[in-house]
Amino acid sequence: MATVPEIKIMRSESLGHRSDVSSPEAKLGMRVEDLWDEQKPQLSPNEKLNACFESIPVSAFPLSSDSQDIEIRSDTSLAEAVQTLSKFKVLSAPVVDVDAPEDASWIDRYIGIVEFPGIVVWLLHQLEPPSPRSPAVAASNGFSHDFTTDVLDNGDSAVTSGNFFEVLTSSELYKNTKVRDISGTFRWAPFLALQKENSFLTMLLLLSKYKMKSIPVVDLGVAKIENIITQSGVIHMLAECAGLLWFEDWGIKTLSEVGLPIMSKDHIIKIYEDEPVLQAFKLMRRKRIGGIPVIERNSEKPVGNISLRDVQFLLTAPEIYHDYRSITTKNFLVSVREHLEKCGDTSAPIMSGVIACTKNHTLKELILMLDAEKIHRIYVVDDFGNLEGLITLRDIIARLVHEPSGYFGDFFDGVMPLPENYRV
């Protein structure tokens, strides 16, 4: 039986060094190296990096193998969309408008990006009490009147019981809801995209200061997305640059030297292992965060991590919770790990347990670990394993560049970053 893994403290001696200078990311790093050598000596290291990244177009960023050619039609059911995102292990995918004309431009061809945060919004909306309370309303959604009454009468205990998600995922509502029906949860309207000639600096600032997790790159002459650059992709690029002068000059700094972690233990949103798993997703939605640590009640030590992408395991494998009277965060973690072990998928981030570091680790060590483990956050602990802080991919990218005064100008004109009903 799977158990909750112990905290894994990052050890610098186990990280190794990059040696594949032929990778596209390493070649890109060497391009930065050449530009670094050309910068004026009076510039600070941060100013040099800004100048280097401003000189490189985003078209030079290696194509993403994870998200290439993964598009979802607007008439795809939500159930199929969840299966697609889960199958290809991606957090999001662009949605193609099936009603768009064949000669449509890219901005008319796509209606947005569907992502797990939006799916969480939809899921939690289904758990709100239906109104009016009638058999007809329940039947129209594909639920039995008895099941709806149970949810109303028993509240959270009903929606966290082991069979709730089996009923939900077999309902007509889940099967018939289309991706276009949840377009109000899309992060951008339709979404913010970069043109191929935009700079790396623009891209890095959007992924850090402006909190975008992924950015489509488009060619105005082509009605198709050319590439999708993610925070994880940038971290992988940086990991491939280990050994290069500019990277070593920046990466040798310790976390405490660069002001990390930004978020201290008193401000971390957390959940205890005996609380309902849906409470974790509610907290992530309410606080607009991508993940949350699961804490042991007695010791206050982190024993796991639940991220927004993990909602897929409630919807793609609801049968694994059938025997539980209540799906707590601990039950959820144990069940998902057992399920993935049986499926032979031991590389999923949820299998890693708690990956942690200390304030004495360097940026380079942190980047190599995040890239190796394919995770989006790392917890900072003290010598006794107690939680001290949290560092995300965005925090690291934000330490790489800074925004010059007036840099974006009218770049955001006409863009709607967050729809009114977007709550993640």
UniProtKB/Swiss-Prot annotation:
Major site of localization recorded for this protein? mitochondrion
The free-text tissue note of the record is:
Expressed in vegetative organs and, to lower extent, in reproductive organs.
Where in this protein does the record say Phosphoserine is found? S44
Q: Which residues carry this modification: N-acetylalanine?
A: A2
What induces this one? Strongly induced in the dark.
Alphabetical GO biological process terms: fatty acid biosynthetic process; nitrate assimilation
SMART domains cross-referenced by the UniProt entry: CBS
| Any one GO cellular component localisation term in the record | mitochondrion
PROSITE patterns on file: CBS
Maturation and modification: Sumoylated by SIZ1.
Read off the InterPro entries from this record: AMPK_gamma/SDS23_families, CBS_dom, CBS_dom_sf
Q: Recorded GO terms, molecular function?
A: ATP binding; protein kinase regulator activity
Tell me where it resides.
Answer: Mitochondrion
Entries under Gene3D superfamilies matching the protein:
CBS-domain (3.10.580.10)
- Keyword field: Acetylation, ATP-binding, Carbohydrate metabolism, CBS domain, Fatty acid biosynthesis, Fatty acid metabolism, Lipid biosynthesis, Lipid metabolism, Mitochondrion, Nitrate assimilation, Nucleotide-binding, Phosphoprotein, Repeat, Ubl conjugation
Pfam families of this UniProt entry? CBS
Domain CBS, by residue range, is 63-131, 185-244, 263-324, 350-408
Q: What does this protein do?
A: Regulatory subunit of the probable trimeric SNF1-related protein kinase (SnRK) complex, which may play a role in a signal transduction cascade regulating gene expression and carbohydrate metabolism in higher plants. The SnRK complex may also be involved in the regulation of fatty acid synthesis by phosphorylation of acetyl-CoA carboxylase and in assimilation of nitrogen by phosphorylating nitrate reductase.
Q: How does it assemble?
A: Subunit of a probable heterotrimeric complex consisting of an alpha catalytic (KIN10 or KIN11) subunit, and a beta (KINB) and a gamma (KING or SNF4) non-catalytic regulatory subunits. Interacts with HXK1 in mitochondrion.
Family per UniProt? Belongs to the 5'-AMP-activated protein kinase gamma subunit family.
**Protein name, as recorded:** SNF1-related protein kinase regulatory subunit gamma-1
- Gene symbol here is KING1
